[in-house]
Amino acid sequence: MSRVAIIDFGSQFTQLLARRIRELNVYSEIFPHDIAFDYIKDSKAFILSGGPKSVLDFTGMPPIVHDIIELNKKTSVPVLGVCYGLQLLSNYFNSTIVHGCGQEFGKAILNVVKKSEMIKDVWKVGDQPYVWMSHADSVYDTPCGFEVIACSVVNNAIAMISNEERRIYGVQFHPEVYHTPDGVKLLANFVRIAGCDNNWTVESFLDEQENLIKKQVGDKKVIAALSGGVDSSVAAALTYRAIGDQLHCIFIDNGLLRYNEAEKVRQSFVDQFQMPVTIVDRSSVFLDKLQFVTDPEQKRKIIGKTFIEVFEEEANKIGNVEFLMQGTIYPDVIESGGSVGKESVTIKSHHNVGGLPDIMKLQLVEPLKLLFKDEVRLLGKKLGISDEILMRHPFPGPGLAIRIIGEITQEKVNMLQAADEIYINLIKKYNLYDVIWQAFAVLLPVKTVGVMGDSRTYGYTCALRAVTSSDGMTAECFPFGVDLETKIIFYEFLQDVSNTIVNNVQGINRVVYDTTSKPPATIEWE
């Protein structure tokens, strides 16, 4: 399978660049700029990403750029520089880079002045297409051996260059963002120029990964901590398809999960897939250790430590286990700095099993570590996993422990589980679940006076949270950013959910809605 290697110089859009290439059914992979070149020199094409640094600040060209250009000199392997990547290429080929002069942020209009294979069937000479810019430095003059393909209408700054003979291209704008309408078409031209195979599909990944799991594991036993979330569920289904009963899934009920979670996991995996899952109820153990604890970080540590103790105890009952399966996905690998070819590789562990590979001396099986979240969901569909699991909202590792503000008791857990179940079910009834990125209820350590019938009540306050987001890094309170009709429906929904919770959950007599964005707040309360 041919690969487009994306060299990451720190752009916030690097993952998006990889996704756009994969949407063209071409396999792309992100590598840090300090990777050993031998690991990637067999790539079909190279893309130099954008980044926050300035070419004017370093004293020498990054070695990876020199290696790629030298390879191109011998083989004409295609190279594309995006934003900072363009400036790196231009600097390498003796162009002048200037700061401040020609800077642009946001929407921009180009003048197309020359033909290029990069713009074939997309733009023609004389066109003035919209693109999206985000740069303070600019390329002042044409690099040696290159031609200018497009300039900015506003300041005539160089926006696109090409060396057709050597198949080296550079763009000052970001083709990977949706604000550049023709960006994907330009990237499609680049992979066409490179002669990349269009065979990166969920089906091809499934077949290949199944064989890789069989080869890695052989006849040995594999254990997995099943959480009921998207990633661990898809990873477990794929691994079970590959090795069958050699996989031993353990689901630990810590008493802080969503309502009836253990039963839902049993129905999904035991009933649907006939996959053996050991369901271990240790609710009392976790709740006992959390008694009188109010600090959220202390809660997390206690839950993490107790989880490892329980998981290790259950794993030892199986015996002779050599592998641990984890639902690590590609963004986890990238964000933790892990990549092939680096001197030290740190893989982000599952929130509850961090440290287990070292403690139990297990080898890792990570069947999803090359997939983005949307690809994981597509794979899950191919494996027959229900939308009930695949489209679930994110749920924190410590569970309801960080949604019960203050001390945790069984009574509070019961109240919050009931309130949250009502909230989520009504969200689905109003057809809002798929347009909300994450929604949940929070139990506050605040009691207020209320009236029910002719009696005075003194009960807890429940806060509702619902946000829209693309990646969880930033978030807006729902229903900002949606149409007026949805907003009207949402206000009707809030009245409905408030009344339903207060009338059906004993101990809660007031419901409030959290309207804070991230930043300044975080999505979770603790």
Swiss-Prot record:
Any one GO molecular function term: GMP synthase activity
Active site annotation, chain numbering: C83, H174, E176
A cellular-component GO term for this protein: cytosol
Keywords linked to the UniProt accession: ATP-binding, Glutamine amidotransferase, GMP biosynthesis, Ligase, Nucleotide-binding, Purine biosynthesis
Superkingdom of the source species: Bacteria
Pathway(s) this gene product operates in, as recorded in its UniProt entry: Purine metabolism; GMP biosynthesis; GMP from XMP (L-Gln route): step 1/1
All copies of domain Glutamine amidotransferase type-1, residue ranges: 3-199
EC number from the UniProt entry: 6.3.5.2
Residue positions binding ATP: S227, G228, G229, V230, D231, S232, S233
UniProt-listed CDD domains: GATase1_GMP_Synthase, GMP_synthase_C
SUPFAM superfamilies documented for this protein: Adenine nucleotide alpha hydrolases-like, Class I glutamine amidotransferase-like, GMP synthetase C-terminal dimerisation domain
Record has ATP-binding as a keyword: yes
Short name of one Pfam family: GMP_synt_C
InterPro entries linked: Class_I_gatase-like (IPR029062), GATASE (IPR017926), GMP_synth_C (IPR001674), GMP_synth_GATase (IPR004739), GMP_synthase (IPR022955), GMPS_ATP_PPase_dom (IPR025777), NAD/GMP_synthase (IPR022310), Rossmann-like_a/b/a_fold (IPR014729)
Occurrences of domain GMPS ATP-PPase (ranges): 200-392
Reaction catalyzed: XMP + L-glutamine + ATP + H2O = GMP + L-glutamate + AMP + diphosphate + 2 H(+)
Top enzyme class: ligase
Subunit-level organization: Homodimer.
Physiological role: Catalyzes the synthesis of GMP from XMP.
Protein name: GMP synthase [glutamine-hydrolyzing]
Species this protein is from: Ehrlichia chaffeensis (strain ATCC CRL-10679 / Arkansas)
Source organism phylogeny: Bacteria, Pseudomonadati, Pseudomonadota, Alphaproteobacteria, Rickettsiales
Gene: guaA
